[in-house]
């Protein structure tokens, strides 16, 4: 596991990029190796903006500036104590009649293919996807789901894509990773940044499956710290090509791909100073260029059917026209590629959970113990109910995000990170409980649950390790709140010119701190039958925002070092966003009279009751509990002693 530390320069790069993509095109969940750009968001990712500018004069604070569009992100708003509902209410429905019909025509054949042709157990045993399966997927168009139709793809929207990702996730995560590594990250850069010539040259080949693609970022010396990449691409004196040298590790499809998105350092001369600096540039590299080789497939715990290997570049001549994006903009390209595929994992794992729950229910329905079917026992009932709730939340997040992207919203990076954290942890819990319900049978190889458990484990690591993504969620949210606090500080320099702003903020804080509440409400937004859960969500938002502000005021820019605190703020944010998402979906079901509406109401209410309790207790302890501060100090001291001792400090109680 990589360290959460990052250099200040990388943190500032992320701030300049805004940690978001300006494009909303996303494809099937793509699984990079166990590192990701999201790991880059740790530690100092918000330091620059949480610093109040020292040189800002009172005149400057009131100077007219170009208006910045107010974010419509619910997640951004909740850190500020705002109820921003544009992206979450009502639950979005974005497919046109034509898109819905096309999707229906795809769902049947894809589902039948995975039921009748693909053999996940055999793929796992062979440690490769069978050739017949790959050929069948090519014929289905599965290698170019979001490539424009005029370039040989299916041209699917994000929501259409999510539905197919769910089907793949129900059946075989090894195949899912193979497809995702190809199109979600492998050639995604060409979709996002490719020139007309690059798109016309490469997209038809990758869409047909004639050529597989891979994403080459990670190196032995660079995990979280992309700036430490050693691969180099030196321009030729004539300027017609670059000579690429270096190696990449843990590359999905590395041994199969013919087209690679590769990141390497290039020397760039500063026009102003004449100094030469190394900056990362992205390239489209073909195996046919020569000098591209790969190692043996890695032996892995799970997703064995997917190919993972090292890739080597030895004196590869890359034409200058194969630069992806601008020279020196490789960091931006990498971040945006990775940020654009996050929702698909939620859709995929929603499907995985659906299949696991079906196995658990089947076993509970038919298994008799102590003279009764085990589904009649309270312990089993609670397990099944919790599994269903986790799947419902995950599925609701997946289709909320895909719809937001299809609607053209740009600000969803916190929500996307939340969905990745939630779905990967929920899927692990569901798989674990499925085995528990099935007992010894679940531990056996034949039912296939043990394979799914092995496959699921990686999802908490790649696409951004969840520990690091939690820091990103908290820091990104605090960054936006920090900007607001800086604005209030500037307003105080000219109080008579900002009376309305200051009075409004003072009133809001007073209401929160006296327990009256902010006056926010979801009344008239959520369905009346969900009004109690809506009130719980608003109360939770008030409690959460109060703590965020208090901790920012206390720690200021130093909050980037308070990882114990940040993790718990992130947990609150995850719970709160999940509450709002299921409130939105269940409200739609009740309003439109869906047959499952009352069942969805129970799922929603159950989640909201427990999530609100967690938020209330966690925020209260962060706000005033000396025991928590003692706990954090103990964690530091225990860990330090273990590192100094090379392991456990305590000995065996027998003393032998």
Curated annotation (Swiss-Prot):
GO terms for cellular component: mitochondrial inner membrane; mitochondrial nucleoid; mitochondrion; nucleolus; nucleoplasm. The modification N6-acetyllysine is found at residues 52, 72, 128, 240, 277, 279, 299, 317, 332, 483, 551, 557. Residues 42-483 are annotated as: Catalytic. The active site is at 463 (proton acceptor). Substrate binds at residues 462-464. It is found in: Mitochondrion inner membrane. PANTHER family: ACYL-COA DEHYDROGENASE (PTHR43884), VERY LONG-CHAIN SPECIFIC ACYL-COA DEHYDROGENASE, MITOCHONDRIAL (PTHR43884:SF11). PROSITE patterns: ACYL_COA_DH_1 (PS00072), ACYL_COA_DH_2 (PS00073). One of its GO terms (molecular function) is flavin adenine dinucleotide binding. S-nitrosylation at Cys-238 in liver improves catalytic efficiency. Very long-chain specific acyl-CoA dehydrogenase is one of the acyl-CoA dehydrogenases that catalyze the first step of mitochondrial fatty acid beta-oxidation, an aerobic process breaking down fatty acids into acetyl-CoA and allowing the production of energy from fats. Residues 1-41 form a transit peptide. Its cofactor is FAD. It comes from Mus musculus. The modification N6-succinyllysine is found at residues 72, 128, 196, 240, 269, 277, 279, 332, 373, 483, 557, 640. Its EC number is 1.3.8.9. Residues 1-33 are annotated as: Disordered. Pathway: Lipid metabolism; mitochondrial fatty acid beta-oxidation. The modification S-nitrosocysteine is found at residue 238. It is a peripheral membrane protein. This is Very long-chain specific acyl-CoA dehydrogenase, mitochondrial. Homodimer. Homodimerizes after import into the mitochondrion. Belongs to the acyl-CoA dehydrogenase family.
């Amino acid at each position: 596991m990589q360290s959460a530390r990052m250099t200040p320069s990388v943190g500032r790069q992320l701030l300049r990029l805004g940690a978001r993509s300006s494009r909303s095109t996303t494809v099937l969940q793509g699984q990079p190796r166990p590192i990701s750009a999201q790991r880059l968001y740790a530690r100092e990712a918000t330091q620059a903006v949480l610093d109040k500018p020292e040189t800002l004069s009172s005149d400057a604070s009131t100077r007219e500036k170009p208006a910045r569009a107010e974010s419509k992100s619910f997640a951004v708003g909740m850190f500020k104590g705002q109820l921003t509902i544009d992206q979450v209410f009502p639950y979005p429905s974005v497919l046109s009649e034509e898109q819905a019909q096309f999707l229906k025509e795809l769902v049947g054949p894809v589902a039948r293919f995975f039921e009748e042709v693909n053999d996940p157990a055999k793929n796992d045993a062979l440690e490769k996807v069978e050739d017949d399966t790959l050929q069948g997927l090519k014929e289905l168009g599965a290698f170019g789901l979001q490539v424009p139709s005029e370039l040989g793809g299916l041209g699917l929207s994000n929501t259409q894509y999510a539905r197919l990702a769910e089907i793949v996730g129900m059946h075989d995560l090894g195949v899912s990773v193979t497809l995702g590594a190809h199109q979600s990250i492998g050639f995604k850069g060409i979709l996002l940044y490719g020139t007309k010539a690059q798109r016309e040259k490469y997209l038809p080949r990758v869409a047909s499956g004639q050529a597989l693609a891979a994403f080459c970022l990670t190196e032995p010396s660079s995990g979280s710290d992309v700036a430490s990449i050693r691969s180099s691409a030196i321009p030729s004196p004539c300027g017609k090509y670059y000579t690429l040298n270096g190696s990449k590790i843990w590359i999905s499809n590395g041994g199969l791909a013919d087209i690679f998105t590769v990141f390497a350092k290039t020397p760039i001369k500063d026009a102003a100073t004449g100094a030469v600096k190394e900056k990362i540039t992205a390239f489209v590299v073909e195996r046919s260029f020569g000098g591209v080789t790969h190692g043996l497939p890695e032996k892995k715990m799970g997703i064995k059917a997917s190919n993972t290997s090292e890739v080597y570049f030895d004196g590869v001549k890359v034409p200058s026209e194969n630069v992806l994006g601008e020279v020196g903009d490789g960091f931006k390209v990498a971040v945006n590629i990775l940020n654009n595929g996050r929702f698909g994992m939620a859709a995929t794992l929603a499907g995985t959970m659906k299949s696991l729950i079906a196995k658990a229910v089947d076993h509970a329905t038919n298994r008799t113990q102590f003279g009764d079917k085990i589904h009649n026992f309270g312990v089993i009932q609670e397990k099944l109910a919790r599994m269903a709730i986790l799947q419902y939340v995950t599925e609701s997040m997946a289709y909320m995000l895909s719809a937001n992207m299809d609607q053209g919203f740009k600000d969803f990076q916190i929500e996307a990170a939340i969905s990745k954290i939630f779905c990967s942890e929920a899927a692990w819990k569901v798989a674990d409980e499925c085995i528990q319900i099935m007992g010894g049978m679940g531990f056996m190889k034949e039912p296939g649950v043990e394979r799914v458990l092995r496959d699921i484990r990686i999802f908490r690591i790649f696409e951004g390790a969840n520990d690091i993504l939690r820091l990103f969620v908290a820091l990104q949210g605090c960054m936006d709140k920090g900007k607001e606090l800086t604005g209030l500080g500037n307003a105080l320099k000219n109080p008579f010119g900002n009376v309305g702003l200051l009075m409004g903020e003072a009133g809001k804080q007073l209401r929160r701190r006296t327990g009256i509440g902010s006056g926010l409400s979801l009344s008239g937004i959520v369905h009346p039958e969900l009004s109690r859960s809506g009130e719980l969500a608003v109360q939770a938002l008030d409690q959460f925002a109060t703590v965020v502000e208090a901790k920012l005021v206390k720690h200021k820019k130093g909050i980037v070092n308070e990882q114990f605190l940040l993790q718990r703020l992130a947990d609150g944010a995850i719970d709160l966003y999940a509450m709002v998402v299921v409130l939105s979906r269940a409200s739609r079901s009740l309003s439109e009279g869906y047959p499952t509406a009352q069942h969805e109401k129970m799922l929603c209410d159950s989640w909201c009751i427990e999530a609100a309790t967690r938020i209330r207790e966690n925020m209260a302890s962060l706000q005033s509990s000396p025991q928590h501060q003692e706990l954090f100090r103990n964690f530091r001291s225990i860990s330090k002693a273990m590192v100094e001792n090379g392991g456990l400090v305590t000995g065996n109680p027998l003393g032998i």
